[in-house]
Amino acid sequence: MPGGRRGPSRQQLSRSALPSLQTLVGGGLSNGAGLRCRSSSAVGLSAPPLTALITPEPVRHSRIPDLPLDSNLLFETLLLLYLLVALLVQYINIYRTVWWSSYSQPTASTSLNFHLMDAHLAVFIAVMLSRRLVWTLLSEVCVACPASPLCYVLLLVVRVCVLTLCGWVLCWTLLNLFRSHSVLKLLFLGYPFGVYVPLCCLHQDGSPAADCGFADADGADGALLQPRDFLTLLRENLRQQLSGTHTHTHTHTCPPSPELIRSEVQQLKTDFNRRIKEVLFNSLLSAYYVAFLPLCFVKSTQYYDMRWSCEHLIMVWINAFVMLMSHLLPPHYCDLLHRCAAHLGRWQRLEPGSCSNTPQHTWSDSTIWPQGVLVRHSRCLYKAVGPYNVALPSDVSHARFYFLFHKPLRLLNVLIGIECSVVVYQLYSLLRSERWNHTLSLGLILVCNYYVLFKLLRDRLVLGKAYSHPLGSAGLGMKRD
């Protein structure tokens, strides 16, 4: 009414000081007692939404069965056999002949032009492909042998002899290749390692100091930093690439505090990035030496099907990528990432004026936020998406971590989709192939792909039933905080 006393507007009510969610979520209040005490000093203060009074339910995890996994030695053996078969297929594609023609021509008396092949190059490629298997075999022998001075000396002698033999073979092949090829072609032999050193050895995941290749010095409060030894970085990365194994075993303990959850996420994120780096490097290295390097040493007068050879290169890289991903990211490791993502949660950024009538809170790093709560952080408005949210709203890496792993079967479904696409395409190419080398190469590669696809589908079937089971059932022994 004109001249009357105006009451507080709707916007003033919605933006009035509300009790902090720290006192409401997990704060030990019951039936809104704390709210009634605070509301006596605020005129016309409406009750906060129901979601602010609900304590987030403890996160329940599905317990997955123990699936059979290939040992490191068995996996490296299977990977080496696959790469050797792929190398044989590439040589067939390059040096094939019309062997059914008249035998009057010496080059047509066999199915391949063996006189055009470089045996030293083939030996060099085979040694480079077997580096992981040799190192894994030596590591397994060291673990299996008892701890005694005599065994230690014998293992040391065996290691020195094996590594010396491999080095001598590489030097012998390089010397013969140097005599018969130009320096430009020889540069292709070590090109992957020349790229790996500046891209990977100089970048260490983890803390910011480690990212730049620096280590803490023994100064006051660790304020001074020293550059880490380049040879140390190179030795650590080469040992990791040679062995292909991870000595650090991560476990999920359902940490109670948000700080511990974010710390666990950081550790798992660093370990996951290291595994992905290993997968990418080794898959690209395998495809490079198997399918690309033989093409670099083909004589200019030699004719071969460029399209088919490049297609084989892509297929080898995809298959090696899937094999390494399935081995380095096993089901129990993906389940570990999923459990951590369930505790982390995610924030969705909103427009500042989209929820003006909804209570908004100031984000706190020591609070576990329930789903649907609106918080302000760094002058931006965010909405809690997960049922359990402790992530930093402005941290994009937390959002990516939750997106990748909050669904436990996402990575496995992606790998199955990639492998199924490759198998279907190869079957289609096999039906349309008219040349004997195409039929032979597709048949050999498909046998290897069937084994990989079988393991992926088996894991998907078992894990799908385990994760689809109701979480409240006691039959599966559900784990909760």
Swiss-Prot record:
Q: What is its main location?
A: endoplasmic reticulum
Q: What does this protein do?
A: Regulates autophagy by controlling the spatial distribution and levels of the intracellular phosphatidylinositol 4-phosphate (PtdIns(4)P) pools. Modulates (PtdIns(4)P) levels by regulating the ER-to-Golgi trafficking of the phosphatidylinositide phosphatase SACM1L.
* Keyword Transferase among record annotations: no
TM segments? 74-94, 109-129, 150-170, 182-202, 278-298, 313-333, 411-431, 437-457
Which keywords does UniProt give here?
Autophagy, Endoplasmic reticulum, Membrane, Transmembrane, Transmembrane helix
Report the sequence similarity comment from the record.
Answer: Belongs to the TMEM39 family.
**Full protein name:** Transmembrane protein 39A
An example of a Pfam family matching this protein is Tmp39
GO terms (BP aspect): autophagy; cellular response to cold; negative regulation of autophagosome assembly; negative regulation of autophagosome maturation; response to cold
GO terms under cellular component: endoplasmic reticulum membrane
Membrane topology, as annotated, equals:
Multi-pass membrane protein
Annotated compartments: Endoplasmic reticulum membrane
